[in-house]
Amino acid sequence: MFKSYTSNDNLLLPPCLGDFIPQNDPVRVVHRIIEQINLEKLYRRYSPQGCSAYHPRMMLQILVYAYLRNIYSSRRIEEFCRNDIRFMWLTGNVTPDHNTINRFRSSRLKDVLKTIFATIVKFLVAEGFVSLDVACTDGTKMEADANRYTFVWGKSIHTRISRIAEQLEEIWQYAESVTKQELRDSAPITYQDITPEKVEKALCQIDDALNGVDADRKMKAKVRRVRKSWPEQLRKYESQGKILDGRNSYSKTDNDATFMRMKEDHMRNGQLKPGYNPQISTNRQFILNYTIHQCAGDTSTYPLHMDNFHSLYGRYPDVSVCDAGYGSEENYLYAFRHGIETFIKYNNFHKEQKRNFRNDPFLSANFYYNEETDGMYCPMGQRMERLSDARRITDNGFVQTISRYRARNCKGCPLRCRCHRSRSERIVQVNHRLRKIKEREREKLLSDEGLKYRSQRPQDVEAVFGNLKNNKHFKRFHLRGLKKVEIEFALLAIAYNLAKVAS
């Protein structure tokens, strides 16, 4: 009735672990490809002296295969190395502990894993799995391994320093009025040059001036109190400013994480959480390039992302396909300078295709512009005079030129109520260089080739993020610090690509 079994039966010969693993198992793909790539840079991170270490090729294989199996904890990886036949086959029946696995992941792979990732992608290109000619780029936000209530805000630091400067000025003026003499400095410290040393020196001068003078006891006590606390607070704000490094916020748990509004907002309250902004470029749903950014927006990440692509492969993609989050003047010109053909949507691209937008003569985008005479004409046909040119500087230091035009006489115009509601004449702002770029880009996006790339992009790059977040359950990083986050995402990208090969 039942098949017999014996748990304690001994075999005549020791079994080979590979005999129990199917030939089409993903672990064989991981083993085969990583065995073929050059890991010389990784070997150089080891010293020939001291006790022998676990082989870095074997350690890399078990980490990549663990990420392929959605195993991200070093303790769970150690457990699988002891109990899972596939991990035992990769390690050759040796079992590195979780500390060894974590040290290898966090320290040994630093600054070399990106090169290993590029080597694997080049191998896949040579095998015909993927091409570097077309790159679909997109980004997403992922939570950092940090508590959501450990925020430090840049504006809050600015406010507190300003408050100290204002109170110091009040104390200074009081000391001058009581002592009936001018203090050595004509004025206290402004916000721009406030430092702990200058504040300490100023408070010492005030304290010396108030000694032996019939002054308010509360004011004297306050001076003695802030003489101890303010320099210490300013040193704290100074160190926090260095950590911010131009950002608006950071987390005390992970100083490199920035507070962002995540796409997964289960409470629907727009709560900010510490996280990173990974950017990837894909082709045929293989990840070609990745970068990790600390800013929430995608627009400013494009030049750095493409520079990284060039550093990995010595070339830029022939075609770059992106959504409207990357459609800025800076990015279009960057791609043009480096010979990249762009199919990048811009803001209002889809809105422009609607009949209501095209047929509305009162929208500034539909105003007629004569390039030869530099004339902008309103719906009534009146020529608008050019007022001035303004400059705008982006976060990356890119300079935009904005031209301002003003209508000559809106008073008594029969179309005024439909044209604008301001009391003065209507003013229109135009970026002429961006306007020309948009005209060229619109023509490409509406062509047959543009329609092909626009329909291909969501299936390519957005499907990868959906796979990583939902099928691989990777919605939050498990390591802290920008360098370690880059290592973890590289392992995830390598594992994802090799899983695609295995499938």
Q: What do these predicted regions represent?
A:
Residues N10, Q23, H55, L113, ...:
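Generic alpha-helical segment signature
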Residues P22-V64, H432, I437:
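Basic, short loop/linker segments at the boundary and entry of helix-turn-helix/winged-helix-like folds
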Residues K3-S7, C51-S52, W89:
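A short, ordered amphipathic alpha-helix with a cationic face
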Residues Q36-K41, D84, M88, N471:
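A short secondary-structure junction motif
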Residues K3-S4, L63, N70-N83, V94-S503:
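Anion-binding and metal-coordination hotspots
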Residues M1-R28:
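Hydrophobic alpha-helical membrane-insertion signals
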